[in-house]
């Protein structure tokens, strides 16, 4: 982070330091996780707990994406990806269409994703579509049960997702799950 700031001529921001501290904790936990997973005895006995993810929110232009990119580049993990949340949901809908008729397609989809990625970094987590709101809880729950960790940026606190949206009650369990599974950090 410090190196990237200097290279770009940016100045450190006090509010960003809360996000950086949360991401540093997450990165440290990933380093510890990798060390535990490297132990053959541990591999046979049980999986160590995955690092707790981070939900970093704040206004436009607060540097959330920049901070997350620094984290993504530094985290010692090969099975990771970073993408825009809208792009991710578009791909989810495409794959759900392919899985039409399959029992519990969101579980199948989460298992597929977990084979490729342990960590997913979402930029601009935002729900604007009723269809997304309706499937989000089952999708996130399946991802967490399939041992995936999430780090995300958003312009909104989780409670502010999909305000006044059609069938907003359908997204409330997903919001609670996000708050339970991720460390929520305000960078304003």
Go through each PLM region and give its residues.
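Phosphate-binding P-loop
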Residues: 29, 34-36, 42-51
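Short hydrophobic/aromatic beta-strand immediately N-terminal to the Walker A/P-loop
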Residues: 53-57
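Walker A (P-loop) phosphate-binding loop of P-loop NTPases
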Residues: 61
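Conserved lysine of the Walker
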Residues: 64
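Hydrophobic positions on the alpha1 helix immediately C-terminal to the Walker A/P-loop
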Residues: 67, 71, 84
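Post-Walker A helix-loop "phosphate-sensing" segment adjacent to the P-loop in P-loop NTPases
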Residues: 73-81
């Amino acid at each position: 982070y410090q190196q990237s700031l200097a290279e770009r001529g940016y100045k450190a921001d006090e509010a960003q330091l809360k996000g950086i501290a949360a991401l540093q904790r997450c990165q440290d936990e990933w380093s510890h996780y990798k060390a535990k997973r490297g132990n053959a005895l541990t591999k046979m006995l049980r999986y160590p707990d995955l690092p707790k993810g981070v939900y970093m929110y704040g206004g436009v232009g607060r540097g959330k994406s920049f901070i997350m990119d620094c984290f993504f580049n530094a985290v010692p993990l090969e099975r990771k990806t970073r993408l825009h949340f809208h792009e991710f949901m578009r791909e989810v809908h495409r794959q759900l269409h392919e899985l039409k008729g399959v029992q519990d397609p969101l579980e199948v989809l989460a298992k597929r994703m977990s084979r490729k990625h342990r960590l997913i970094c979402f930029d601009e987590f935002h729900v604007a579509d009723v269809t997304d709101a309706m499937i989000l809880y089952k999708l996130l729950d399946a991802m967490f049960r399939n041992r995936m960790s999430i780090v995300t940026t958003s312009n909104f606190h989780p409670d502010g997702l999909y305000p006044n949206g059609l069938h907003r009650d359908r997204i409330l369990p997903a919001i609670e799950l996000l708050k339970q599974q991720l460390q929520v950090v305000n960078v304003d």
